[in-house]
């Protein structure tokens, strides 16, 4: 069981909303969009959990080529769960993330309140933009 699997199971067991993305793809597209031969393709192994969702992300963790800890099967985190603002933290285990979840007391209720606040703020901004256009 991977670190991401352990974290996903914890989130499910504690009713914390999340979306998980797993992407195992071979890419053969060059920068100019021309299809390359098989010898120039590369493999993208990307796994991500977003809390509560991709669109409204309070925090997320990834394990993909190039992320801090990927080669060791460890997680990289970004967002509200990290110790330093606007930074990523790597080489984390699922247990490291779980301890932070418990420290911040994330729950369905707290995340729902955050999400509602975020959506209301976007609605207010959209209303103000419409007033500016009139």
Language model: regions and residue ranges:
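Amphipathic alpha-helical segments
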Residues: 3-17
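Short linear sequence elements within intrinsically disordered, low-complexity coil regions
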Residues: 15, 23-26, 32, 83, ...
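Intrinsic low-complexity, intrinsically disordered segments enriched in polar/basic residues
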Residues: 1, 13-14, 43, 121-122, ...
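Short, flexible coil/linker elements and helix-boundary hinge sites characteristic
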Residues: 14-15, 27-28, 33-34, 48, ...
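Compositionally biased, intrinsically disordered low-complexity segments
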Residues: 9, 19-21, 32, 37, ...
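Polar low-complexity intrinsically disordered regions enriched in Ser/Thr and small residues
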Residues: 5, 31, 35-36, 69-72, ...
């Amino acid at each position: 069981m991977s670190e991401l699997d352990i974290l996903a199971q914890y989130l499910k067991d504690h009713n914390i909303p999340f979306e998980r993305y797993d992407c195992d793809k071979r890419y053969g597209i060059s920068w100019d969009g021309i299809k390359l031969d098989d010898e120039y393709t590369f493999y993208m192994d990307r796994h991500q959990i977003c809390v509560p969702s991709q669109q409204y992300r309070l925090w997320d963790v990834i394990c993909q080529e190039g992320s801090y800890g990927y080669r060791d099967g460890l997680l990289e985190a970004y967002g509200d769960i990290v110790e330093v603002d606007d930074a990523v933290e790597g080489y984390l285990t699922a247990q490291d993330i779980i301890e932070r979840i418990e420290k911040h007391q994330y729950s369905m209720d707290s995340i729902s309140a955050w999400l509602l606040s975020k959506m209301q703020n976007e609605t207010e901004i959209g209303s103000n933009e419409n007033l500016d256009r009139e």
